[in-house]
Structure formats: C-alpha cells, structure tokens
C-alpha cells in the first residue's frame, strides 16, 4: 500500500499533479492518504520516503530561504533519527543529473547551481539524503521505483 501525505494536493481535479494519481490508478497501485512525518510518499511499513519537489527553484528555496530551510531541515533530521532513508525527487524537464544542476541558475533568487549542488552534497554526507531527478511524465514510475527498489 502506497501512503501519500495528506498535504499533497495531487488529488484535486484540474491540479497539475493529477498525472501522479492517474499513473497509480492505471497501474493498479493501491494508495491511501494520511499524514506522513517525513516526505510525501512511502510504502506502508517501508524504510524509504520520497519527498517530491517541483524543480530546482523549490529545492533551492528549501535549502537557502531561512523559513523554508528550518522546516526542511527538521524533516531531514526526523528522517535520519527515525532510520528512514529520505530521497528527494526533483521533477524538472531537462535536469537529469548533477552536471545539469551545476549549470543551473535560479531566475528568482540568484542561487547558482554550484552552490545548490554543494548544499545537496552536504545533506548527502551528513544525513544520507539522496537526490534524484525526473521529468513530469516519469514521476509516478520513479516514485515507485525508488520505494520498491531503493534505486
């Protein structure tokens, strides 16, 4: 059973995240909404949680904006202390690897990709957080791959 954080808005009609629910329904994946302490998606009884981000702008805000950073880091620490492996899945067309992140630059905050990559490495080393990338079309498949195989 896939657990979906009840703060995720992807079940609302017309929502830009409808593709995730459609993927699960098409593939017969059972899911239930409930409040998750860590991440947005988790298998019942599993030790991996996926925290989906809409793109590098969102994760850069989580890592560099004071208010967002505190909330995000609290979640990272909760996962680490609970023994849950946190995987941040960044959904953005054209971003497939760390080299793409390094070349990126925020249009809103001026954060460079190189700085963002440094922040990501720090979380990987300190807390075991893993960062993965996908586009919109493959997001549902990647969430399930990560949760079922750990890859």
Enumerate the language-model features and the residues they cover.
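Active-site ExK catalytic segment of metal-dependent nucleases
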Residues: 47-58
């Amino acid at each position: 059973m896939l657990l979906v954080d009840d703060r995720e808005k992807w079940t609302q009609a017309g929502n830009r995240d409808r593709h995730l629910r459609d993927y699960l329904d098409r593939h017969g994946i059972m899911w239930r909404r409930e409040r998750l302490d860590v991440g947005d998606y988790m298998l019942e009884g599993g030790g991996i949680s996926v925290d989906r981000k809409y793109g590098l702008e969102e994760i850069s805000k989580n890592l560099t904006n004071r208010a967002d950073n505190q909330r995000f880091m609290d979640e990272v620490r909760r996962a680490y202390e609970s023994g849950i492996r946190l995987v941040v899945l960044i959904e953005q067309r054209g971003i497939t690897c760390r080299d793409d992140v390094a070349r990126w630059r925020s249009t809103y905050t001026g954060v460079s990709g190189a700085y963002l990559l440094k922040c990501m490495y720090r979380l990987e080393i300190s807390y075991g957080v893993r960062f993965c990338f996908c586009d919109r079309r493959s997001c549902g498949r990647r969430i399930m791959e990560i949760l079922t195989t750990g890859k």
